[in-house]
């Protein structure tokens, strides 16, 4: 059980080594886990000398990211095949001799390699890193074609006892009621592809993470979200 989360925001000026907002957390084992807000749904995690990238893309919304300037990945996780989540060029730039690529079934087909995880699968990446693939899909009328049930993944990462939920592209699906004990959650909020702000609030109230990072939000106005989530530390970073 996590009894305490310590976090600090580090801002680094554009043009220096790291121009991205960072949040640092202490794990129960006394190590540090750092999140870098790259762009849209792309997240970089650093932990105990390991580099983990979630849905890295080289271009999104007018932003360009040069992954050749970043360390090679130990692990790359891809939620699904849409272009704002799956980018072959980004994967190639980040791939080194020991990189492990974890994807949903469709992305493995498109890329030609990768360790496949379907909803419900679990994978031990290291002694202190476990991943569970969870459902991510649309439920609203007129949206189900964007992310059909059973195709895409969200991921729950357990890193040295710290539990992180990366939701992927999803709405506030019933399966969220089964997601317990989350320390840090990344929930999407843009229309028509993921959640409305109201759905985001509902999902956060269901999951009850200690810390919530809205992401994948485009031009969505999130100014009223934090006030509706008493007891949850809502942090809005520059993903767009």
Please place each PLM-identified region on the residue numbering.
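Bacterial N-terminal signal peptides
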Residues: 2-12
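Metallo-beta-lactamase
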Residues: 17-30, 38, 103-162, 235-240
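Pre-active-site segment of Zn-dependent metallo-hydrolases
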Residues: 20-30, 38, 42-81, 88-92, ...
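Active-site neighborhood of phospho(di)ester-bond hydrolases with catalytic His/Asp-centered motifs
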Residues: 54-56, 73-84, 101-105, 165-168, ...
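Active-site environment of divalent metal-dependent phosphoester hydrolases
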Residues: 59-62, 82-86, 108-110, 121-124, ...
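Active-site HxH/HxHxD metal-binding segment of metal-dependent hydrolases
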Residues: 64-123
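Binuclear metal-ion centers of metallo-dependent hydrolases, dominated by the metallo-beta-lactamase
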Residues: 113-125, 129, 201, 205-240
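Active-site-proximal loop/helix segments of hydrolase catalytic cores
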Residues: 138-206, 218
């Amino acid at each position: 059980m996590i009894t305490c989360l310590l976090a600090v925001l580090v801002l680094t000026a554009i043009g220096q080594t790291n121009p991205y907002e960072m949040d640092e957390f202490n794990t129960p084992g006394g190590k540090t886990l750092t999140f870098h807000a790259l762009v849209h749904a792309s997240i970089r995690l650093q932990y105990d000398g390991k580099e983990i990238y979630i849905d890295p893309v080289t271009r999104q919304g007018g932003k360009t990211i040069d992954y050749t300037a970043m360390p090679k990945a130990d692990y790359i996780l891809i939620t699904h095949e849409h272009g704002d989540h799956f980018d072959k060029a980004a994967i190639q730039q980040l791939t080194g001799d020991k990189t492990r690529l974890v994807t949903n079934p469709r992305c493995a087909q498109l890329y030609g390699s990768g360790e496949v995880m379907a909803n419900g699968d679990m994978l031990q990446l290291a002694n202190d890193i476990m991943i569970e693939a969870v459902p991510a899909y649309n439920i609203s009328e007129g949206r189900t074609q964007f992310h059909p049930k059973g195709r895409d993944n969200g991921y729950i990462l357990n890193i040295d006892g710290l539990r992180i939920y990366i939701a992927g592209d999803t709405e506030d699906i019933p399966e969220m009621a089964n997601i317990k004990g989350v320390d840090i959650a990344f929930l999407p909020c843009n229309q028509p592809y993921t959640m409305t702000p109201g759905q985001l609030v509902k999902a956060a109230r269901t999951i009850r993470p200690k810390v919530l990072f809205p992401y994948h939000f485009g031009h969505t106005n999130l100014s009223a979200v934090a006030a509706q989530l008493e007891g949850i530390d809502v942090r809005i970073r520059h993903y767009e």
